[in-house]
C-alpha cells in the first residue's frame, strides 16, 4: 500500500498524562507515517489515545465487553478510494501487552495502528480465512516499516 497525502489524520489524547506517555513512544509524525503505510485511501482518520477507564467504557458501550481492550475501530464509511473512521487505542493495555509478549511498546503500537487502519478499510478477523489474510498483510506492512513479525513471541 502506498501513502496518500489526501488522508487527513487527527491524533487526540484523552489527557496530558496520556499525551506525555504517547510522546515517549512515538511522535505524531511517526504515527502518521505508520498510518499512511497502511492505507492508500484519502479521507479522515481520527486516532484517540485513552486511559483504561475510557477504554473500558467504550468497549462496554460498543462491544458489551466489560474490560479495556487494546484497540477499537469505528469505520463510518469506506470505498475503494476513501475512508472515514475513528480508532481508539488504550495505552495502558498496549504497554501491558507489549511487556507480556516480549515486544517493545513502539513495535506493538505500530502493529495495532496498522491493525486498526486495516479494520477501517473493511478487513476483519472473524473467520480463519479473513484472519490469515489480515495477518499476512500486517506482517508485510510492518516489515516495510522496519518491524519484525508481530505474531512471533519476541521482538
UniProtKB/Swiss-Prot annotation:
Its EC number is 3.1.-.-. It is an enzyme of class 3 (hydrolase). Its cofactor is Zn(2+). The keyword Zinc applies. Zn(2+) binds at residues 115, 119, 125. Binds 1 zinc ion. GO terms for cellular component: cytoplasm. GO terms for molecular function: metalloendopeptidase activity; RNA endonuclease activity; zinc ion binding. It comes from the Bacteria. Keywords: Cytoplasm, Endonuclease, Hydrolase, Metal-binding, Nuclease, Ribosome biogenesis, rRNA processing, Zinc. GO terms for biological process: rRNA processing. Pfam families: YbeY. The keyword Hydrolase applies. Its main location: cytoplasm. It is found in: Cytoplasm. Belongs to the endoribonuclease YbeY family. Single strand-specific metallo-endoribonuclease involved in late-stage 70S ribosome quality control and in maturation of the 3' terminus of the 16S rRNA. This is Endoribonuclease YbeY. It comes from Polynucleobacter asymbioticus (strain DSM 18221 / CIP 109841 / QLW-P1DMWA-1). The gene is ybeY.
